[in-house]
């Protein structure tokens, strides 16, 4: 059975120590676009737009222009540009000696950590900023989808009115089987349906056929002990896994390993071209996936 692959990307700097715009966004995106042009395919880019707010706040005009021009290129080439919000940008500080941002303060990592008024202000500003940038190229451009920063879409009840307000019908924040709880992250998708696309209303992990929202989840696959061993023995774990950029990320804390024996348990990994992945295993899992649509992050 042939598969449809949805290529989605979080268009962002590293979110602990940012690294540079040039190395973390501009160069890798340009490589992607060159490949996409050659293969005649399109991608979905979720733009971490609060970065633009901070560039303007600190008067970093050169980076602002480069960032906006890159988004313009995405729109001009027919790629989908959608909303992505990391509110801990509000506490970020620019380190001029390093020419990068310090985002180590994660108190506001999740939108749900904000007061109701601040949450609405941040969401509204982010939506308007991204819409304005896109309309500089296409006056009819409309944002239709959202991905929560760090996938932290739960609890959804505080975000639902804002998606309704701006007529955003699609969410792509659910990663099946995954769970994380730390100072920065919180999500629990362990009960999410393994369905490529579904409607929901008040809970993005529960199907509601009459729901007004559409969930396009990122699927996960299981890496068993035998896969881990073969990856180590034959050097396949991490093939093609080259790190782009010069920053440091905020790593989600999944199931904490309490003993050495827990290292031998199977783990779940998103269908992803980011982070620690085994290319051969990923391709085999995708080929054997029962769903005919696969979303990759």
Give residue spans per PLM region.
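Active-site beta->alpha N-cap acidic-glycine motif
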Residues: 1-77, 147
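Hydrophobic faces of well-ordered beta-strands that scaffold small-molecule active sites
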Residues: 5-9, 43-45, 81-85, 144-146, ...
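Aromatic- and acidic-residue-enriched carbohydrate-binding clefts of CAZyme catalytic domains
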Residues: 8, 96-113
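The substrate-binding groove and active-site-proximal loops of carbohydrate-active enzymes
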Residues: 12-24, 50-61, 107-119, 144-152, ...
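Acidic (Asp/Glu)-rich catalytic clusters
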Residues: 32-41, 60-84, 90, 98-101, ...
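CE4/NodB-like, metal-dependent polysaccharide N-deacetylase domain
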Residues: 37-38, 112-150, 208, 216, ...
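Short, solvent-exposed beta-strand-terminating loops
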Residues: 81-96, 222-228, 236
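Active-site-adjacent pocket scaffolds in enzyme catalytic domains
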Residues: 148-289
């Amino acid at each position: 059975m042939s598969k449809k692959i949805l290529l989605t990307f979080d268009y962002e700097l590293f979110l602990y120590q940012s690294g540079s715009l040039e190395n973390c966004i501009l160069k890798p995106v340009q490589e992607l676009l060159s490949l996409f042009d050659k293969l005649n395919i399109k991608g979905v880019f979720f733009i971490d737009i609060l970065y633009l707010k901070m560039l303007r706040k600190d008067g970093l005009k050169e980076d602002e222009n480069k960032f906006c021009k890159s988004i313009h290129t995405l729109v001009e080439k027919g790629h989908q540009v959608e909303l992505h919000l990391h509110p801990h940008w509000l506490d970020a500080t620019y380190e001029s000696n390093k020419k990068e941002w310090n985002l180590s303060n994660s108190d506001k990592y999740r939108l749900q950590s904000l007061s109701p008024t601040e949450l609405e202000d941040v969401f509204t500003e982010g939506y308007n900023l991204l819409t304005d940038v896109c309309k500089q190229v296409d006056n009819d451009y409309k944002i239709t989808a959202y991905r929560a920063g760090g996938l932290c879409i739960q609890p959804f009840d505080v975000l639902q009115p804002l998606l309704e307000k701006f007529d955003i019908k699609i969410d792509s924040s659910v990663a099946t089987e995954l769970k994380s709880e730390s100072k920065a992250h919180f999500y629990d998708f362990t009960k999410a349906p393994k369905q490529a696309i579904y409607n929901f209303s008040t809970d993005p992990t529960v199907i509601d056929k009459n729901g007004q929202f559409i969930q396009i989840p990122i699927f996960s696959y299981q890496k068993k002990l035998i896969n881990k061993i073969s990856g180590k023995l034959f050097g396949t774990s991490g093939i093609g896994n080259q790190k782009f950029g010069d920053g440091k990320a905020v790593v989600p804390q999944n199931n904490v390993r309490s003993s050495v024996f827990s290292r031998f348990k199977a783990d779940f990994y998103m269908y992803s071209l980011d982070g620690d992945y085994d290319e051969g295993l990923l391709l085999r899992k995708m080929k054997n996936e029962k769903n005919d649509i696969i979303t990759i992050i």
